């Protein structure tokens, strides 16, 4: 995060003065031309600076909400001038379409979305640092996830509604054994409630509107470098509870259509090749695949090398009664995974792997690339609403707010 631009006190003072004038003074376009020429020249000498920082995103907020709030805070600070791009040249035709007395917004972006439920490392690029964010797309990430066994939900986490109650509660030994199927290179089916696109529309939009998917969801190749059971807590010793609401039959059927077969390693072998269909008497049509990597059950049946998948039993007896499910144990998992990995899917699939049901109740991103949650330079999001954050951020980018860059 070293800043290499040479600071010129005179030009810096000129730039700040003209910024204040253009912000608070409404003048004719002809008079503002002089101000824009001066501001343009000053910005050429005081180039935009920037870099990458890590913030600890709080649970309950989206990554976009955090970024918008951070943008507003920094834009109203002294540091904003360092993260704004140079204004357009006065002869630029597009400039005349903009408000003549408005400064450019600061440049800000993040290097990978975290679910609203999740907390932890969110890498933020400021100024020129936004150009470095693409380097984070392929880096490994480390998470600590908490799985609650006993039921599965439509969103695969605690924010969703129950779709199935477990008839078997796994032991610690069963979970340890079940983790073996998810290490190394695996195929992973993304959750229906995700931001992936199918034909220009996000998956969660189809789910919320109750619209059938126009094509099947493709299984994706992922890599799990490390997966360990950090802790196992029996149901009598933790305070987590299952969701209170049960999903509708339509939502359950949508989930049934996504999952090829129930449980076991057989599911992972067929994941990239099969699509499950509900029994014909249930009145649901099959989802036909349009990709070479995900075929319908009919296509798989033609392949003599693949065993015909079992039809999944569709049970809603407990859901129809509206009874509260039994609470199972929790398993705390530490994992280092490739980019694009869905931790929710791993937990959901782990539940099926041990002949049970599970959903995610907590997720913390511990590390992304070289940025770690326990680094002293990682900002807690609450710091930006307390005094002293400007000095800490300036120090991170080696900027002296008094006028000179630090070495």
Swiss-Prot record:
It is found in: Nucleus; Mitochondrion. Keywords: Isomerase, Mitochondrion, Nucleus, Phosphoprotein, tRNA processing. Gene3D superfamilies: Pseudouridine synthase. SUPFAM superfamilies: Pseudouridine synthase. The modification Phosphoserine is found at residues 291, 296. GO terms for cellular component: mitochondrion; nucleus. GO terms for molecular function: pseudouridine synthase activity; RNA binding; tRNA pseudouridine(55) synthase activity. Belongs to the pseudouridine synthase TruB family. This is tRNA pseudouridine synthase 4.
